[in-house]
Amino acid sequence: MPEGSKEAGSPARKRPAPQEEARRHSAAHRVEYALARTLESAVSALPERAADGVGRRIGRTIHRLGIRRKVVEENLRLAFPEQSAEWIHRTSIAAYEHLGREAAAILRLSKLDRQAIIDRTVPVGWDEMEEALSHGKGVMLVTGHYGNWEIAAATVASRGIPIAAIVRRQGNRLVDERLNGLRARLGVEVITQREAPSRVPRLLRKNAVIGIVGDQDARRAGVFVPFFGRPASTHRGPAVFALKLGAPVFACVARRLPGAAVRYEVSGHGVPVVRTGDLEADTTALTAALAARLEAEIRKAPEQYFWFHRRWKTSPPAEQPSSETGTVEAVSAPADPDPDYA
């Protein structure tokens, strides 16, 4: 969908006057935004492979500085207890390098158009998705922080299929608006979390694809399902939408392919939706199935997952934190009223 386009029937939004615009953003946010745009310009000016190399080196430097390194290594130990300390260390470095490369790829989105996305992606399961869309109920496309999730959404849009992504708003609204503008330029419509309950049903009725990144810790509001053999608080939103609205569900990832070229395999496969009449049980079952699909993909290339997030931060209600291992942390915060899908 072109940048600035609006859903049919929605009221036009008046852009704030310059003085009002300035008051909306703090000085710190304006400086942060200026730095981000400078970095974007610098990376975009480089040839793609050079930008990829710069991102990789930046990631490795951040690893050496130790930023969130303990979190990454602890997550890897929890997910792969059978692996050696050497493997954990090596995979940790590779995860930082991957993060740097994909950050550079996202900064270069302004350089890409529809054909550039097509040239960089290899779709898998496309016929399956087109068949699902032929029934006119839209598709729920659920992914995780693996590979490059922005490319996953852009791949759908580049093939001429309307897609809207449910996103979490960034704290810096200037950065948020810039990122959303880049998404819109590639044909990806944006839905904020608070807009989702009203907009998702309308878009599904128009046979659109709804993209959700749903693998972060959901605190007390989540449903606990196995993830790498451990109960993880997971957002129930994707499953609830699918069960209540009757849309087919696809598990999707955009995995970076090996080699010097920047290319991705974007796979999407249907996940069976079982309706027994017990919404809570069905929600848990579907959420668990989606988590299992994501885990299977992560095992193919563990370094491409976002291990920087404390995925097992919240303990199940009946589970007490272990003071000996330190692997489970109790959280006393109330349920999150604004779940984080992105």
Residue ranges and their predicted role:
Residues 2-27, 38, 46, 58, ...:
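Non-catalytic C-terminal accessory region of glycerolipid acyltransferases
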Residues 2-143, 176-179, 187, 331, ...:
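Membrane-anchoring hydrophobic helices of lipid-metabolizing enzymes
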Residues 70-71, 169-173, 231-235:
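Active-site metal-coordination segments of metallo-dependent hydrolases
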Residues 116-121, 168, 185-191, 228-229, ...:
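Short, flexible loop segments at the rims of nucleotide/cofactor-binding pockets, characterized by
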Residues 119-123, 146, 172, 190-193, ...:
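A conditional alpha-helix N-cap/helix-loop micro-motif detector
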Residues 129-130, 153, 179-180, 200-201, ...:
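Short amphipathic alpha-helical segments and helix-helix/interface helices
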Residues 134-194, 217-223, 256:
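Catalytic core of membrane glycerolipid acyltransferases/transacylases, capturing the structured
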